[in-house]
């Protein structure tokens, strides 16, 4: 199926394009305007959203009941005796008469009908069945003179070619004189001269016979008066036989193909139909009150329901009865709002009442805000400019800027939190994780292993404790003995005679990895807080404790390094009591276990304490019989296997071949491995596994879920990526106020250090970025991370650094082949680090080096004026004695008298020792000092010399 545009589909469904675009956006589709193209699945979604409109569009047009019967009728009725009068009861017949009720009217045609030539549809007419118009019944109440006189041909007076009554009126048997011609108004309901012979202005004539049915006549030309069928003379008692007009029939609007109108009930018609005479009541089956016999429902030659003057008019304008098109209520309301809206900065914008709540996503732009309040984005840019902020209409803004704009305009702006944004995103795909958990019954839940996080200060022995638990050696693989990323393992332990599984997550303790440690607290069931017995509570210990308490996670304290000299476990217990962790022996509920990871002491007791806490305080159950849900613990880019993510399954079962989406990455699970590298087919709840097959590297802490198809996973990942990109742009936006803008332009462009970060795992790269962005060395230098990624440094990274003059920072990675040579040729600076301390120190030093130097005044010496010598060549010369320091030539000087500065920013232009020029004069020596053109020198003045020196940065 070819792609269709939104407005085409909206027209097909019978809805407005705006409603279609709004519904598609509510369904989670990215549609910019009504001209956007959408694919077949999206078309089906929109059709399902409007089932009534879709059924109406799919159904054919309502068939016109009389059409098949009319097609089989002869062109003219059979000759018969003329009916002098139409049956009177039919005038009073109700409008919604059945089609069969009008059938007897057909034999009442004029006897002169056979003499009329058969007039069929012209070649240009729209094909369709058409019942020929029979001869009209004789009119009542008129004179009988001239009953069989044919209507003469020739040109007809009047210049309205579309009028239903043309030319001069014919005499009506002398019933009255001709009335004056009313004029030539193409929009009048009665065109041309009125017909004489009606003293009261009305025709009491009976109804015209219908064309065999009361419903609307199918398309086709109607015979023009006097051109086709017979037309009775005015006032005649019988029908007047018509004759063909010389030279062919005159074209009338009735000969034009009728436009398809909405079908009307048979015999109903519409009020105001254009009939042959003004105010003549229509018979059942005709066009309704005033309708012409056999015309479409509503009568007349024009569109149905337009009345006598309902044609397009002489100049192609709208027909009579419509008049000037009125504005809709919405247009009037908008105009009134624009007129009454207060003006700010020369523009008018709609304002709220102070309580109007507007919800925006993170990283929204002024255009998004303008769409919410139906305002012009350019006007909001002007308002923001007058508020002292500079931004473009499509630039992502932070929450503070939106709060400033909303407060000025009377709106309460609410920025959607990441959790709500994620929930709304998944709801567009009919995914509700919280509802799934609430709907699960007890019979569906099965016990699962507890997830334990090891937290604590750096170098307090967390990883070595896990080594003792796993009987492995992980510390040797960490740079500097510091854990750089999260590791997840699962062990089996016999507890009370039962084999129990426990999942451990090791989180780094370095202060730069706060975000990673916080993620570890979000996914865990129990936290083991490791505290060294010799060091006690440290800053990162308190931070880890706060993370665990904020996540409402039970805590088991492991007092490590009890085998070292100076260990004092009681001191640790006393310190932790201040933070709400009271040991059981002190009457609290927190379990403390004294262990030694190096000596392998009390390791089993620690595991038993964890299991006891889990059984006593937690209900660890999950439903394995559903699609998997979980969290990405860590991710990296492997050279041979591609993107590898370590995920923790929290509920459901993850199997090979499932389609998953993790953050901004999506794909199909190609393979799964455990912590020992063994391949797995399925992963049950609380099981950490390595997953292969993702499109890119997800971030540590991103949630993952299994979707029904790959298309859904791709759309979720793309929308997450767009939201994250906008949020990052808003967060990194440099706010420049109008007060600082002129100064920034005068001083030059603000210096920016561009960085490209590459690392071995995504969590380490993100932690490094957060640590670098916290460096603050002043307002004149800005740090900007233009790209970050996982894996080796590639040529694309070097090319990007060349364009943006960036520095590449490699964290536990090296450049790929021939990349180092390319970087040397392009002059790109690449730095490689394995410990985060060195990276932070070097970047901070580089930022300080980019700052403009700051100078401070340094005093050199002072001299007292003893005598003033006047010289015509050099001006006044101060004969002085140096009281302190050194007096140098060409240095800055100032003169003070009685403690007040009388001359500043002077220069010592001449300095002499007796008659010889001197470069400098030291303390207690006499000299002559010349200050150039400055001559206000007297005895007793103090000359102070100084120089500006660059201030060293701390």
From Swiss-Prot:
Q: Which domain of life is it from?
A: Bacteria
- Which residues hold GTP? 456-463, 506-510, 560-563
The answer to whether UniProt assigns keyword Protein biosynthesis to this entry is yes
Q: Where is the composition biased (Basic residues)?
A: 323-332
* Ranges where the record places region G5: 596-598
Record region (G2): 481-485
Q: Name one Pfam family in it.
A: IF2_N
Record's InterPro entries?
EF-G-like_DII, IF2_II, IF2_N, P-loop_NTPase, Small_GTP-bd, T_Tr_GTP-bd_dom, TF_IF2_bacterial-like, TIF_IF2
Stretch list, region G4: 560-563
- Look up the record and report any one GO term of the cellular component aspect: cytosol
* Positions of the UniProt region annotated as Disordered: 56-355
Q: What are the Pro residues biased-composition ranges?
A: 76-87, 241-254
Q: Which family does it belong to?
A: Belongs to the TRAFAC class translation factor GTPase superfamily. Classic translation factor GTPase family. IF-2 subfamily.
The record's annotation in NCBIfam families points to: IF-2, small_GTP
Name of this protein: Translation initiation factor IF-2
**What organism is the protein native to?**
Pseudarthrobacter chlorophenolicus (strain ATCC 700700 / DSM 12829 / CIP 107037 / JCM 12360 / KCTC 9906 / NCIMB 13794 / A6)
């Amino acid at each position: 199926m070819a792609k269709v545009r939104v407005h085409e589909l909206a027209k097909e469904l019978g809805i407005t394009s705006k409603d279609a675009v709004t519904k598609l956006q509510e369904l989670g589709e990215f549609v910019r305007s009504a001209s956007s193209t959408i694919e077949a699945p999206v078309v089906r979604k929109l059709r399902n959203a409007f089932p009534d409109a879709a059924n109406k569009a799919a159904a054919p047009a309502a068939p016109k009941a009389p059409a098949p019967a009319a097609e089989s009728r002869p062109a003219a009725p059979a000759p018969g005796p003329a009916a002098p009068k139409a049956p009177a009861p039919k005038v009073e017949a109700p409008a919604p008469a059945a089609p069969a009720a009008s059938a007897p009217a057909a034999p009442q045609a004029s006897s002169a009908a056979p003499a009329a030539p058969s007039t069929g549809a012209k070649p240009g007419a729209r094909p369709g069945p058409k019942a020929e118009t029979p001869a009209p019944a004789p009119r009542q109440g008129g004179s009988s003179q001239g009953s069989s006189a044919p209507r003469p041909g020739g040109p007809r007076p009047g210049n309205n070619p579309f009028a239903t009554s043309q030319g001069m009126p014919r005499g009506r048997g002398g019933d009255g004189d001709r009335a004056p011609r009313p004029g030539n108004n193409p929009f009048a309901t009665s065109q041309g001269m009125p017909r004489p012979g009606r003293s009261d202005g009305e025709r009491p004539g009976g109804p015209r016979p219908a064309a065999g049915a009361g419903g609307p006549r199918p398309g086709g030309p109607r015979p023009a008066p006097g051109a086709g069928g017979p037309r009775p003379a005015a006032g005649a008692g019988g029908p007047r036989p018509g004759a063909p007009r010389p030279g062919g029939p005159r074209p009338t609007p009735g000969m034009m193909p009728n436009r398809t109108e909405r079908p009307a009930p048979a015999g109903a018609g519409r009020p105001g139909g254009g009939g042959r005479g003004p105010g003549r009541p229509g018979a059942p089956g005709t066009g309704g009150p005033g309708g012409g016999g056999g015309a479409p429902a509503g009568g007349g030659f024009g569109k149905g329901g337009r009345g006598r003057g309902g044609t397009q008019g002489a100049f192609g304008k709208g027909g009579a009865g419509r008049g000037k098109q009125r504005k809709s209520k919405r247009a009037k309301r908008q105009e009134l709002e624009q007129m009454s809206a207060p003006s700010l900065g020369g523009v008018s914008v709609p304002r709220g009442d102070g309580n109007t709540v507007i919800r925006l996503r993170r990283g929204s732009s002024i255009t998004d805000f303008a769409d919410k309040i139906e305002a012009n984005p350019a006007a909001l840019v002007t308002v923001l400019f007058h508020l002292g902020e500079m931004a473009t209409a499509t630039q992502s803004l932070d929450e503070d800027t939106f709060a400033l704009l909303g407060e000025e305009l009377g709106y309460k702006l609410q920025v959607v939190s990441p959790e709500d944004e994620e929930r709304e995103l998944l709801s567009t795909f009919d995914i509700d994780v919280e509802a799934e958990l609430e709907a699960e019954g007890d019979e569906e839940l099965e016990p699962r292993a507890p997830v334990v996080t090891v937290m604590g200060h750096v170098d307090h022995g967390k990883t070595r404790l896990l080594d003792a638990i796993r009987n492995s050696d992980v510390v040797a693989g960490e740079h500097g003995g510091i854990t750089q990323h999260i590791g997840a393992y699962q062990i089996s332990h016999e507890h009370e005679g039962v084999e129990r599984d426990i999942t451990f997550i090791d989180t780094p303790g370095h202060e730069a990895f706060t975000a990673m440690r916080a993620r570890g607290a979000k996914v865990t069931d129990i936290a083991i807080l490791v505290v060294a017995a010799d060091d006690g509570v440290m800053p990162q210990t308190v931070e880890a404790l706060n993370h665990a308490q904020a996540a409402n996670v039970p805590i088991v304290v492991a007092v490590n390094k009890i085998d070292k000299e100076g260990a004092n476990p009681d001191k640790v217990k006393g310190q932790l009591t201040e933070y709400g962790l009271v040991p059981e022996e002190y009457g609290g509920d927190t379990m403390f276990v004294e262990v030694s990871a190096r000596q392998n002491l009390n390791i089993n007791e620690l595991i038993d304490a964890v299991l006891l806490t889990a059984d006593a305080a937690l209900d660890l159950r999950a439903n394995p019989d559903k699609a998997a849900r979980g969290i990405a613990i860590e991710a990296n880019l492997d050279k041979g296997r591609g993107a590898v993510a370590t995920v923790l399954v929290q509920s459901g079962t993850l199997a090979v071949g499932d389609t998953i989406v993790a953050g901004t990455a999506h794909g199909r699970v190609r393979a799964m491995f455990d912590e020992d590298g063994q391949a797995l087919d399925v992963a049950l709840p609380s099981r950490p596994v390595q997953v292969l097959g993702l499109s890119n590297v997800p971030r540590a802490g991103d949630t993952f879920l299994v979707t029904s198809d790959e298309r859904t996973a791709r759309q979720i990942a793309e929308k997450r990526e767009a939201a994250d990109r906008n949020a990052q742009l808003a967060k990194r936006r440099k706010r420049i106020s109008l007060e600082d803008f002129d100064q920034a332009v005068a001083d030059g462009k603000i210096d920016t250090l561009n960085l490209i970060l590459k690392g071995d795992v995504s969590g380490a790269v993100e932690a490094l970025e957060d640590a670098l962005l916290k460096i603050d060395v002043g307002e004149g230098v800005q740090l900007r991370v233009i790209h970050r990624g996982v894996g080796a440094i590639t040529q694309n990274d070097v090319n990007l650094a060349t364009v943006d003059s960036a520095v590449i920072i490699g964290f536990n990675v090296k450049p790929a082949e021939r990349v180092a040579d390319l970087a040397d040729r392009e002059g790109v600076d690449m730095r490689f680090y394995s410990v985060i301390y060195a990276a932070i120190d070097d970047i901070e030093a580089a930022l300080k080096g980019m700052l403009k130097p700051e100078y401070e005044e340094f005093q050199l010496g002072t001299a007292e004026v003893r005598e003033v010598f006047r010289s015509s060549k050099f001006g006044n010369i101060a004969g002085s004695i140096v009281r302190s320091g050194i007096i140098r030539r060409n240095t800055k000087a100032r003169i003070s008298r009685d403690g007040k500065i009388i001359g500043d920013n002077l220069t010592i232009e001449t300095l002499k020792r007796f008659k010889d020029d001197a470069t400098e004069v030291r303390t207690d020596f006499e000299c002559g000092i010349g200050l150039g053109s400055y001559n206000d020198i007297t005895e007793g003045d103090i000359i102070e010399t100084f120089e500006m020196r660059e201030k060293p940065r701390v």
